[in-house]
């Protein structure tokens, strides 16, 4: 099969190449993509050439030309002779690149796929793998029901962190971002309150709303190292801070006694790949990758996990470079971007 695949050729340059995919081997599944979704943080880091993995010699796949994307939905068209449980015509979610078709090797980290509920459309399902990174805030927090939660940074990962916390029963849930459109999207999804940090000290605004000394749970989804101490300041004494956005770099200053130790905060990381760990480990509690993705698909299908206000652009593959420019420079217009292949 001939497939079209988006590649970041080098920093700030995106192209489309055609690749011949062979028939599936015995442990492979061929999927035709209907929709793929853009993970702004990861893809912009590669597009700008700043992603740290591009410079890691132990990760040879992370180099230019690089095929971006890790969240897609489509239809199985062929299965290898050794595959059971899958058949042509199955509608699936999978960690796919931005490509018109993909050959998945079962057993490989990116060779996983999950069946879609009958009432879930491809566009919504295309976001499920990205949503897992936001779900990490609720998973790492453990108890969420009835706990106050603030989400700092309302890009695509922050939106999913906020929406998953709402679905998990946190209350009240507060979104914090300087971009009005992002705050409105959070409100559309059910946020109890939103805060504009450019209008005044975010900590004071949060405490005024809660009537307490901070939130019991804070999710930092900014991807900015210096925002982690800010997130810590938003938490109440004894609260939890979960870092769900990838903070590439070093924070300028953290006073570990005053900001962390004396306040007995718990600060944890929640990269989505933690769910590849066995379910019994303390990292994910009762969760693993398959349970998380099935929950997300079911929650999307039922409406428990809202996509209200999230998708702002539906584009052709040829328009991905322009979308990257918009995500970088027009944050008041761009939030969720999906690529339509059919």
Residue positions per predicted region:
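Glycine-rich cofactor phosphate-binding loops and adjacent beta1-alpha1 units
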Residues: 143, 189-268
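N-terminal glycine-rich beta->alpha transition that marks the start or flank
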Residues: 19-72
């Amino acid at each position: 099969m001939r497939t079209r695949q988006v590649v970041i050729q080098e920093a700030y340059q995106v192209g489309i190449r055609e690749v011949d995919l062979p028939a599936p081997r015995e442990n492979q599944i061929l999927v035709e993509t209907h929709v793929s979704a853009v993970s702004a943080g990861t893809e912009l880091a590669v597009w700008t050439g700043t992603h740290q993995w591009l410079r890691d010699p132990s990760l040879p796949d992370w180099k230019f030309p690089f095929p971006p994307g890790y969240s897609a939905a489509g239809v199985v068209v062929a299965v290898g002779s050794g595959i059971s449980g899958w058949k042509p015509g199955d509608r699936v979610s999978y960690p796919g690149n931005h490509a018109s078709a993909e050959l998945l090797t079962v057993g490989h980290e990116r060779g996983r796929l999950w069946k879609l509920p009958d009432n879930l459309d491809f566009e919504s399902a295309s976001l499920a793998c990205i949503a897992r990174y936001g779900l990490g805030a609720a998973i790492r927090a453990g108890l969420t029901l009835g706990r106050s939660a603030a989400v700092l940074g309302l890009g695509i990962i922050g939106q999913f962190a906020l929406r998953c916390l709402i679905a998990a029963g946190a209350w009240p849930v507060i979104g914090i971002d300087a971009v009005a459109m992002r705050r409105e999207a959070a409100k559309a999804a059910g946020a109890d309150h939103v805060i504009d940090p450019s209008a005044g000290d975010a900590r004071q605004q949060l405490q005024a709303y809660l009537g307490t000394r901070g939130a019991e749970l804070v999710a930092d989804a900014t991807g900015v190292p210096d925002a982690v101490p800010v997130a810590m300041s938003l938490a109440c004494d004894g609260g939890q801070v979960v870092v769900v956005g990838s903070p590439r770099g070093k924070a300028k200053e953290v006073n570990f006694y005053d900001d962390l130790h004396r306040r007995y905060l718990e600060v944890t990381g929640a990269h989505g790949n933690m769910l590849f760990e066995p379910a019994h480990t303390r990292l994910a509690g009762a969760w693993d990758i398959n349970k998380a993705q099935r929950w997300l698909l079911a929650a999307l299908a039922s409406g428990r996990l809202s996509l209200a206000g999230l998708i702002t652009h539906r584009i052709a593959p040829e328009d991905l470079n322009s979308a990257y420019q918009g995500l970088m420079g027009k944050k008041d217009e761009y939030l969720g971007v999906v690529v339509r292949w059919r």
